[in-house]
Curated annotation (Swiss-Prot):
Disordered: annotated segments: 38-191, 579-645
Gene3D superfamilies noted in UniProt: Erythroid Transcription Factor GATA-1, subunit A, Retinoid X Receptor
Single biological process term from Gene Ontology: visual perception
GO MF term (any one): nuclear receptor activity
InterPro entries, A to Z: NHR-like_dom_sf, Nucl_hrmn_rcpt_lig-bd, Nuclear_hormone_rcpt_NR2, Nuclear_hrmn_rcpt, Znf_hrmn_rcpt, Znf_NHR/GATA
One GO cellular component term noted in the UniProt record for this chain: cytoplasm
Coiled coil: none
Biased amino acid composition, Low complexity: 56-68, 171-191, 606-645
Disulfide-linked positions: none
Zinc finger map (NR C4-type): 200-220, 236-260
Compositional bias ranges of the Gly residues kind: 122-141
Native organism: Drosophila melanogaster (Fruit fly)
Protein name: Steroid receptor seven-up, isoform A
Length: 746
């Protein structure tokens, strides 16, 4: 509609003209001429038959209204079209802008040179009147009147923009603006193309932009941000030179983070996580609320809800990714194949480990403790994660997908597998029926991870290995000092006592203590021999040469500290008993009570009030001490009561003469350091009755007690001629439902 050189042959007009944005393509330049000034040869004189068409088009709208007078000189609608074609003025010789435009335009050059407004606003009116008189007969007046308001608006706007620019041969024209805008758009387009082709400096994948100082992909960007925000530390299983590319970037996190830093990604560019202003940080909360006596609810002004909410928010923030990222497991009615289930199970396990590494206080533990905790609770965490993501489990599709019906697996294994799947499915369905939300799942997982019993189990499993090592060192005649070796055991037992005392406040100590008591048989055997040596026996026993390994287990974990006065007597007695003939192991005392469970006389001790740093005074197991029968011994003194623990009557130590040393015990030389180890441990701990730990021995009554030779155990079992031997069938049990006052009964 607008007159421009694009109507002439040889030009390409991709779309209709508009007065808003102009580019080289809009004004009719060919594509090869869009980036520079067209040469002189690009223009040609149109045929004579086209001259009238161009003139009529230029002057068409102007024939109805004549010239339009403005404040700075005249402008006409024909000048609108001529301004759009003013880009080719740069190719022409710079004409004088003060001369008046002629009324006739024999060619394109005259039309362009005479259409520009002069600096003093002179010649636009003359140009319009001349062009109007030359070609007014061929124009429809109605068309011009309809387009008058639109053309007037465009003409006024363009006049204002042109008036603001200095005119002349060196002036800025719309052509230069159009060329500059086109070049900018071309440069931006080339930048976008080049950005899309840039590879990630870390793994070589397609870059999504510049992140933290370097062009990286989204995966490396997220990995670097997560590592910096959470202060994560990694370890390399190789030589710290693992290949990091698109296919191996997830195999070694240490080398990946190392390469991120090497390529120039900046830690300081990562924004740290912000705590909302309404919720103070945990550090400030710890300083604000000073917990007294371990009871946070007793603090004045303490808001337990806000305090716990802050921890819950931290647990939720530690989630590696929302449950919607688990994929198709979120679809309740979807039946998954065995491959997808295996992949999802691995993903759930990895997410549990990732979650545990980011929750409060867990990273502060040692790496060995972290691994031990996760090994203990991974199954519970897996069930909670599977229920949280609504993992669909159906036994029949699982078996069909796994091909168990055609597998060579034995029938009993298939049945066991079915039982495991069924139990797992029942647990998941029960949790799903409760409609547990994300916060509750996070709290449940934290409770499972930080259960006190799990921490004690770790220590309990370490003690037998430690004691075995100590026994090996002492048995081989190591040059190391026995006191130094036993100090390690004593420190470990002190730590167990501390943990045990803390757990008793939560009413969980008996079960954990019972589980730990499976390794006390060695020391109890030595102590029992010392006790039975002082009780008159009616039958002689056969000599057994089986060695006795000192096993200072949890026999001392709930015991009272002894005074220093009885140490020498106990040491002398144990040294003598290590070389003496084993006494009769009939297991009975004068009163007919079975002494195999440790309910007889204890070792000599002097109760010391106030020395309860290692004593578990609040233990419910102490009630079993009050009911323990004392042996019928004339030398037994009266019981010494204490304010915290009921003591068992004990006999006085019987000095052993040197003739006892000439007994026929084959392993006497070996048992001397063993007896010393047991004696040194017994200086600080008093052996509790074995009846208090019956459930542990019920679990292991088919196996030989820890630290006692097989031959020695069988000899003790057969020498009495009855079923109540020392290490035969146990005569104690744990009754959790007893109403007799003590849950531990004979």
């Amino acid at each position: 509609m607008c007159a421009s050189p694009s109507t002439a042959p040889g030009f390409f007009n991709p779309r209709p003209q508009s007065g808003a944005e102009l580019s080289a393509f809009d004004i009719g330049l060919s594509r090869s001429m869009g980036l520079g000034v067209p040469p002189h040869s690009a223009w040609h004189e149109p045929p004579a038959s086209l001259g009238g068409h161009l003139h009529a088009a230029s002057a068409g709208p102007g024939t109805t209204t004549g010239s339009v007078a403005t404040g700075g000189g005249g402008t006409t609608p024909s000048s609108v079209a001529s301004q759009q074609s003013a880009v080719i003025k740069q190719d022409l010789s710079c004409p004088s802008l003060n001369q008046a435009g002629s009324g006739h335009h024999p060619g394109i050059k005259e039309d362009l040179s005479s259409s520009l407004p002069s600096a003093n606003g002179g010649s636009a009116g003359g140009h319009h009147s001349g062009s109007g008189s030359g070609s007014g007969s061929g124009v429809n007046p109605g068309h011009g009147s309809d387009m008058l308001p639109l053309i007037k608006g465009h003409g006024q706007d363009m006049l204002t923009s042109i008036k603001g620019q200095p005119t002349g041969c060196g002036s800025t024209t719309p052509s230069s603006q159009a060329n500059s805008s086109h070049s900018q758009s071309s440069n931006s387009g080339s930048q976008i193309d080049s950005k899309q082709n840039i590879e990630c400096v870390v793994c070589g994948d397609k870059s999504s932009g510049k992140h933290y100082g370097q062009f990286t992909c989204e995966g490396c960007k997220s990995f670097f941000k997560r590592s910096v925000r959470r202060n994560l530390t990694y370890s390399c299983r190789g030589s710290r030179n693992c290949p990091i590319d698109q296919h191996h970037r997830n195999q070694c996190q240490y080398c990946r983070l190392k390469k991120c830093l090497k390529m120039g990604m900046r830690r300081e560019a990562v924004q740290r996580g912000r705590v909302p202003p309404t919720q103070p940080g945990l550090a400030g909360m710890h300083g604000q609320y000073q917990i007294a006596n371990g009871d946070p609810m007793g603090i004045a002004g303490f808001n337990g809800h806000s305090y716990l909410s802050s921890y819950i928010s931290l647990l939720l923030r530690a989630e590696p990714y929302p449950t919607s990222r688990y994929g198709q497991c979120m679809q309740p009615n979807n039946i998954m194949g065995i491959d997808n289930i295996c992949e999802l199970a691995a993903r759930l396990l990895f997410s549990a480990v990732e979650w545990a590494k980011n929750i409060p206080f867990f990273p502060e533990l040692q790496v060995t403790d972290q691994v031990a905790l996760l090994r203990l609770v991974w199954s519970e965490l897996f069930v909670l994660n599977a229920s949280q993501c609504s993992m669909p489990l159906h036994v029949a599709p699982l078996l069909a997908a796994a091909g168990l019906h055609a597998s060579p697996m034995a029938a009993d294994r298939v049945v066991a597998f079915m039982d495991h799947i069924r139990i797992f499915q029942e647990q998941v369905e029960k949790l799903k029926a409760l409609h547990v939300d994300s916060a509750e799942y996070s709290c449940l997982k934290a409770i499972v991870l930080f259960t006190t019993g799990k921490l004690l189990d770790i220590l309990y499993k370490d003690v037998p290995a430690l004691l075995t090592k100590v026994s090996a060192l002492l048995g081989k005649g190591s040059t190391a000092s026995n006191d130094d070796v036993l100090a390690v055991v004593r420190d470990h037992l002190d730590e167990l006592n501390r943990q045990e005392q803390e757990s008793q406040a939560q009413q969980q100590a008996p079960l954990h203590l019972a589980a730990f008591m499976n390794c006390v048989a060695g020391v109890e055997a030595a102590v029992q021999q010392a006790e039975q040596a002082q009780v008159p026996t009616s039958s002689a026993s056969a000599s057994v040469s089986a060695p006795l390994v000192p096993s200072a287990g949890s026999a001392f974990s709930s015991c009272q500290a002894k005074s220093a006065g009885s140490e020498m007597d106990l040491l002398a007695s144990l040294y003598a008993q290590a070389q003496a003939t084993p006494p009769s192991s009939g297991g009975g005392d004068a009163s007919g009570h079975n002494n195999s469970s440790g309910l007889g006389a204890s070792l000599p001790t002097q109760s010391q009030s106030g020395s309860s740093s290692r004593n578990l005074t609040a233990s419910p197991l102490s009630t079993s001490l009050a009911t323990a029968p004392a042996p019928a011994s004339a030398s037994a003194p009266a019981p010494v009561p204490t304010s915290s623990v009921a003591q068992v009557p004990v006999p006085a130590p019987v000095p052993v003469t040197s003739s006892a040393s000439s007994s026929s015990l084959g392993g006497g030389a070996y048992q001397t350091p063993s007896a010393a180890a047991a004696a040194a441990a017994m200086f600080h701990y008093q052996t509790p009755p074995r009846a208090a730990f019956g459930s542990a021995f019920d679990m292991f009554h088919h196996s030989t007690p820890f630290g006692v030779g097989v031959g020695h155990a069988h000899a003790l079992a057969h020498s009495s001629g009855s079923g109540s031997a020392s290490f035969g069938s146990p005569s104690y049990r744990y009754s959790p439902y007893s109403l007799a006052g003590s849950r531990w009964q004979l």
